[in-house]
Amino acid sequence: MNMPEERKRREGAPLLEVDGLSVDFAVDNFWVPAAKKLTYDVRPGEALAIVGESGSGKSVSSMALLGLLPKNARVTGSARLDGREILSLKGDDLRRIRGREIAVIFQEPMTALNPVFTVGFQIIETLRMHFGMTPSAAKARALELLDMVDLPDPLKAFNSYPHQLSGGQRQRAMIAQSI
C-alpha cells in the first residue's frame, strides 16, 4: 500500500497517539520522575499546546518522542506516529522519522542551531538528508520555507549565521527547518 492510500485508510485517526508516557531519570541509584502518565492525541490539522510550570516535564516528554534523552532516562508508555510505535525506534529507523515526520522546535533556538554553519546550510542539510533533494532544489526549497515563515529577507537569513539573527528570526528559521 502506498503512502496516500495508507493516509486515506487512516483518515480521521490521530496522527500522534501518546498513551501513558512517563519519563524517569536515574539519579544516585533512584528513579526520579520527570513526566508522569501523559496521554493525548493529535489529529491531522490540529495544534496541541502542552503547558505547565517550569520543570513539569514538557520538554522532557517531547524529547522522549524523538529519542533525544540521555542514557540515564527511562521512558515507559506508548507513542504511535501514524499508527507506528516510535518509542522503541533506534538508530537509522529513528533518524528517518526525526525531522521528516516529527520535529521539535526548541524554546531557545541558539542552542539548537549550529553556530558554525549558516542557517541556509542547516536547512539544506535537513532537506537533502530526508528528501534526497539536489543541492539546488534544496536551496530553492529552503528559501521558500524561510519566506513562508515571514522572514523579511529570506536570502539574507539563509546566508546568515545564527548569531547574526534576532531571537525571533532564529525561532522562525527553526520553524522553517521543521516544516
Predicted ranges, named:
Residues 1-179:
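ABC transporter nucleotide-binding domains
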